[in-house]
């Protein structure tokens, strides 16, 4: 009798474990909210984000002493234009124009916050008065989109003024061709500083139509050339892992792409360079430029890492060796468009395992706290997936 009871209990335990495992498998196979309703995720995350923008239009980086950057303002403007949120767009634009225009041009100071004396202003002692060409270009594009979205000519006129000064202050003509530099400060040394993630490939055909006096398509050509060389050349390593670097320099005499001249800037693939993947993918989505898909197909390391580990890290040296063991939601989101074009199966896996879980359908917000940068870039990844990043210049 005891033997029969023992066997019965053993069978019951096995059956219970089987049922638990089966339920776990069912749960794993069950689609997540972000997989079923991707458009709702994009809309709800924007509502949650814009609710945290100050009433006067200032975006905050709460993890860095509540600073504001021209980059952060540009992201808010782009997102507001895509989400057809004119009220938020106008608030953010007003604050940006009032507080970040501190020079004799139409470009924007990149860093604003509280100085050592407790005063809130552009942080000049930290180089905050300088411009950043990525933010300036994104703001110009957002203004063009606002003009097309809401049919107010003032937006277009400001965009044209910004484009004129980008060309005057942030672009240099070398051997008869235009090259985009990282900012108005980038020509201070014998070699010029370039950040490849500042190349707005998708925007240049639009800028060419709005500002035909300047050779924006020529800039697109040199930007792809610089990016391809920066990616494939060893730079300061023995070999290249075929990843875009965060920073490089260009020799104005030979046009050779070389390691950055500043010690605090590296050739790693990290929190700057991942944006290249998103920007190039958007160029393909909007313009079907063959250079975009050719470049994405040339990228190494990330696909291999995912196939081996179903993950990849947030920083790789230029030779492709991992520099950390940390993962990043921002970088997964920025890389998602790349995978969606060159390996849809990996894109599907990445979206489910690394992105979809970041959304809490009950809270209609992120499932865990993310910093300002991640909140924006995860949204850009979600929006690319949901096809909520249209070229608004095509609006009639």
Predicted stretch roles:
Residues 28-44, 66-70, 105, 109, ...:
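Extended ligand-binding clefts on enzyme/binding-domain cores
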Residues 49, 83, 96-99, 103, ...:
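Alpha-helical solenoid scaffolds that mediate protein-protein interactions
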Residues 36-136, 379, 383-386:
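N-terminal carbohydrate-binding/catalytic regions of secreted carbohydrate-active enzymes
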Residues 72-88, 95-98, 138-152, 199-212, ...:
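Well-ordered alpha-helical scaffold segments within catalytic/enzyme domains
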Residues 320-396:
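C-terminal functional modules
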